[in-house]
């Protein structure tokens, strides 16, 4: 079933949590658009080539360390970890671009999506030349 929050469409995949997923990636206007590229915690769209450590917002290149969203002291600046695995609204591309009703999914929500949907890799989707992963509900959500 397709619904909308603001101008963005979402789908109900019948997940146990009741979570709804956006029909398209952030920045996409239709299912054959790839949308924007983001590094974790960045709200500024990048090209795929720009998504490298040296450009990462929370990477201290002088110290080869993470300054935020770090769960391992080996990588934290001066060994400091913040154990953050969920984006703050100020660092959430979906929230910043699509509005406060939207956010990037957590790792657990991605796992729920994988565990409770059928998904397949599609090449040349409907003759458009676009490749991507298609997720389909395992339950009837109509």
Predicted features and spans:
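Conserved positions within compact, well-structured domain cores
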Residues: 1-142
């Amino acid at each position: 079933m397709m619904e909308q929050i603001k101008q963005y469409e979402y789908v109900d995949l019948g997940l146990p949590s009741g979570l709804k997923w956006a029909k398209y990636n952030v920045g996409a206007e239709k299912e054959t658009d790839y949308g924007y590229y983001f590094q974790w915690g960045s709200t500024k769209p990048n090209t795929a080539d720009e998504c490298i450590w040296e450009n990462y917002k929370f990477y201290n290149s002088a110290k080869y360390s993470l300054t935020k969203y770090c769960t391992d002291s080996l990588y934290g600046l001066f060994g400091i970890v913040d154990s953050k695995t969920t984006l703050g609204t100020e660092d959430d591309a979906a929230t910043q671009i699509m509005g406060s009703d939207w956010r990037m999914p957590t790792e657990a929500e991605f796992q729920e999506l994988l565990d409770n949907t059928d998904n397949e890799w599609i090449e040349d989707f409907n003759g458009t030349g676009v490749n991507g992963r298609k997720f389909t509900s395992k339950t009837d959500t109509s």
